[in-house]
Amino acid sequence: MRKIIVGSRKSKLALTQTNWFIDQLKALGLPYEFEVKEIVTKGDVILDVTLSKVGGKGLFVKEIEHALLTKEIDMAVHSMKDMPAVLPDGLTIGCTPKRVDPRDAFISKNGESFKDLAEGAILGTSSLRRSAQLLAARPDLQVKWIRGNIDTRLRKLKDEDYDAIILATAGLQRMGWDGEVITEHLDETLCVPAVGQGALAIECREDDTDLLQLLAHINDAVTERTVAAERVFLHKLEGGCQVPIAGYATLKENDAIELTALVGSMDGSVLLKEIVVGIDPKQVGLEAADRLIKQGAKELILAANKEQQ
């Protein structure tokens, strides 16, 4: 019986996601056993700086990918939105389980909705994507950066001077907390989700054919196709956490993919948005990027990167 070593970050959410996925594999009843190896990433250690200032995408995966390449672990369970657009040579996303709710969750201290927040209220987020879109809708709000895991951010909302914070609905759902803490879900038209938000990425070595065959049992074809379109878009624009960039795809009738893609200025004064429909994920992602580039997306990305140096 093969033992599969599964790499995971140490946070409660990461371990919850990892153990959930292992349970899906165990339910297949195949001759494998599993062991979780906890790994600390750079993003877990640097908590006093915004994500955009410490290197963006890859902050929560690089150390885990190193463990995969050196064969300390056999596979890893990541949040798809933490994954860089390009993986290291030798690694692949072996499986994308069915995506859960991709929306952002708005949580206010006193139960007000986003539109009813007082003028000048303080909104906590560590995401340029969220801050740009929400400032576009409510330029009067003050954005204050907030870092830490879900528990830490909820505690900061209660104890510090934040009036509201934004978290991913998916994480709260996986922890079983969505019913008790979320004030409202932000509609995708108000706040386009991050590329891959709500989805998991199961990463492994591309030459591990035995494991790839096992992972194929849990793969969700719709999630795989829609997330692929989002990630092609992200790659073409070379976007990471340093840029207000969003991409969310759904599957429509007749198997068409509809991708809503967005790039914004840091302060939300400019939001460029395109909706592209097509069958091939790669073509949809590339077309969305090309259309936004024609609108001036590259200039916004350069300006955002410069602003943070």
Curated annotation (Swiss-Prot):
PROSITE patterns: PORPHOBILINOGEN_DEAM. Coiled coil: none annotated. The keyword Transferase applies. The keyword Transferase applies. It holds the Pfam family Porphobil_deam. GO terms for molecular function: hydroxymethylbilane synthase activity. Disulfide bonds: none annotated. Pathway: Porphyrin-containing compound metabolism; protoporphyrin-IX biosynthesis; coproporphyrinogen-III from 5-aminolevulinate: step 2/4. GO terms for biological process: protoporphyrinogen IX biosynthetic process. One of its GO terms (cellular component) is cytoplasm. Tetrapolymerization of the monopyrrole PBG into the hydroxymethylbilane pre-uroporphyrinogen in several discrete steps. This is Porphobilinogen deaminase. It comes from Bacillus mycoides (strain KBAB4). The gene is hemC.
